[in-house]
Amino acid sequence: MTKYSQIAIVDSMTPKSVEYYEKLKKAGVNDVIVTLSRSGYSSYSEIAEIHTDIARRLDMRVHAALSTDLRSPFHDARHFFSVYKYLGYNFGSKTMIMCYPDGNVKNAAKTLHELLGYISYFVNKDDLDVAISKNYLDEGVLNLTDIPDYFNLTVINPNKLNAGVDRAGTWIYTEYFEDEIQLLGYDYYGFYTGQSNQLTLDAEYVAQEGDTWVTIATRHGVWLPKLLDMNDAKYEDKIIPGQRIRLF
């Protein structure tokens, strides 16, 4: 797999130990997204405080996450902000809105927009990320058109070839690390890490180890036959790291 910059989402399932975080750092993770609040939980701040403290002590970049079922956008935003402020997160911190729509929510898109509106009062829209499972998109619980394209999009699609969504800026590729339940992701464009791995504004892409014609076509939204034709290549041709691939 291509060596993109990595992020880790931590929550109540994540081991609360310095040793575990050191293992994450050794694996190449230096950006941690700490779940500060979760719908239906009033005491989540204690867990968030421990994870925030450990990550900061190890000089990891710390970002914030709100896990929501979209049932009560105002309550979710208010509780999130109280923890956000208490733990010293500030304007400019990246914030992930993790959407797990409750089945009783009649209009998930409307409530998501309401929640994003509340959060935008204290988080710049350029620092907001909407995270959602690929399954919810496939089932139509939420559609890509429901998520404004000026927000980063994180797609949770573990154990697959790629994010499965061309627009994805971050892809959660696994749910496990060191035999623990742990969401890890590739940060394609450096939204969290500040390290972009793609020449998105250029007509060419510099191939990295593990790239294939399929992954490049999917990631850049290029029709595979067209990509092959532009590069005078065949589907079975191997890609060499450092090779320059024409995108348009």
Per-region residue spans from a language model:
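Anion (oxyanion) recognition and catalysis
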Residues: 56, 164, 218
